[in-house]
């Protein structure tokens, strides 16, 4: 009778029940699952089968001993007591992995050293020779796990993790491990669908991991058939004849599977850079006759199997990690739902996602959800039957003349809150649109938290929409805030009739110091817009602000009207949009000062766009320092400082409330006789110092500097006209 060993199989969190079923099918007896593992009993043949055929395990460990550990010395003695001559040649190589802690062993490196020392000392005492350490490809890899004073000492039969099948030498930005992909396919019912001759399509296939794993299952190919080196290859307990028998059996099954008519398995990928790596992976896996990959956008996804058979749509859409990804992800899921409803009636779909709340935006009900972990990220597999009765849209599916189901043409139905938000946008558009068309305003604020539960600012930039989400108070449930954001983002394209890809979203929080200048993205896309006869460059993606403060539109137009023949000074000039207006208005010269080189470069482009350059001076400096040294005279000065600012180039921090008196005194000293200084800022609690009002002729003109799009929010800024008494 063959020896029976205790076997311990590790796996990613969430795969335990699937691995338990798989391991039992491969012969593991007395099996039971625990967190990220399955343990049971089996012969060496069972252990070999698990190594060769498990699609889900990370490692197959053969348990050598279990023992209590009181301290490092007792652990050393227990490991030393094992007869290591049965497992490792004294002149061979060894690697030790240690996990867990306790019993005075709180450092895994120290624990591994003690285990290694015990093995080396054992072999040296018996043979006079000692093994050397090879952490990459050892003859034997030993693992010791310590948990609550109990140690489990094992041999790693698998060697490198079993998810490394050997075919995926090229991968994309966010790949799924092969065993996780296999688990998702099993949960999605692919083995049954494949057995019935069904098809499989992945509309966002990346480098093809789902496709290869699906083909390996369908063709009855052992996932690790092509692996050449195993953890047991140089283990002294290895039985080569038994292994050869099992390996030849697996080769025969693979040959028989590949000899069958291939199933229809197709992948589509928008990124052309991933197409060849994916095809290379498929070729290495030996399933090139079964799997085909094409370049294609999600918008054109329409699987058409050769025999018209239905099957499984499987995909792992991207999930966002930076601010602003919400909109693109929302619309991606909406598009995925639309393609399923339009082109995949009668199919099953499995959407594996790290953002399951976005699954609700597909417009199709998920009848089953499975929890997984992709590393440390909690994920879900959303299972969907693509049938009209499952659609959550503005209409139910209809029937064609031949009785076949026809997908609804409408987008996913808005939630009740989303519809209310859409109605408000359309109401505002009717009111503000008339004003914007009459005054030829291309860029304006359409919505500014009009409904408190939808705390957004929605700005129109020509045929683009720029959305800023105001950060919710800590008292607001983040999940509810995100759900409302998704409601709003779903409503915007429908309400405004804009393409989804022309909606850009950011999160607005209080910006201080360097953060106000930090990039949010690096797309570098500039959009040209018009205002009052000038052309200006805005960037909707890369920075928190777009390069154009919409609330200052009336101030810029005022400057344009008053600038003729005057020397114009623009302090804290940002992208110098006011300077462009002054130059257009006929200013004799302009000087613009800002601490940000990025925005001064932007300012230079704005001026060049309008044909101005020679007389326009751009100064890279701290405004306060520059004012202390400048001796020029200016008939028109505009100051719109940030609330706070700091930089390595500054001494200290600029605070508009604290530093206003010095700032205005320095600037007024530069004001030419008969000149005017306009001062504005956006600090809602700002109060103009009484000493300023006592020394100069001060007139608050805030009301005159607000157009209809900001009339609902009179605290957006305050503005004053200041002259010498």
Curated annotation (Swiss-Prot):
Its EC number is 2.1.1.173, 2.1.1.264. It comes from the Bacteria. It catalyses: guanosine(2445) in 23S rRNA + S-adenosyl-L-methionine = N(2)-methylguanosine(2445) in 23S rRNA + S-adenosyl-L-homocysteine + H(+); guanosine(2069) in 23S rRNA + S-adenosyl-L-methionine = N(2)-methylguanosine(2069) in 23S rRNA + S-adenosyl-L-homocysteine + H(+). Residues 393-412 are annotated as: Disordered. It is found in: Cytoplasm. The keyword Isomerase does not apply. GO terms for cellular component: cytoplasm. It is an enzyme of class 2 (transferase). Residues 395-404 have a biased composition (Basic and acidic residues). GO terms for molecular function: 23S rRNA (guanine(2445)-N(2))-methyltransferase activity; RNA binding; rRNA (guanine-N7-)-methyltransferase activity. Residues 46-157 form the THUMP domain. It holds the Pfam family THUMP. Keywords: Cytoplasm, Methyltransferase, RNA-binding, rRNA processing, S-adenosyl-L-methionine, Transferase. PROSITE patterns: THUMP (PS51165). The keyword Repressor does not apply. InterPro entries: 23SrRNA_methyltr_KL (IPR017244), DNA_methylase_N6_adenine_CS (IPR002052), RlmKL-like_Mtase (IPR000241), RlmL_1st (IPR054170), SAM-dep_methyl-trfase (IPR019614), SAM-dependent_MTases_sf (IPR029063), THUMP_dom (IPR004114). PANTHER family: RIBOSOMAL RNA LARGE SUBUNIT METHYLTRANSFERASE K/L, RIBOSOMAL RNA LARGE SUBUNIT METHYLTRANSFERASE K_L. Specifically methylates the guanine in position 2445 (m2G2445) and the guanine in position 2069 (m7G2069) of 23S rRNA. NCBIfam families: PRK11783.1. Belongs to the methyltransferase superfamily. RlmKL family. This is Ribosomal RNA large subunit methyltransferase K/L. It comes from Pseudomonas paraeruginosa (strain DSM 24068 / PA7). The gene is rlmL.
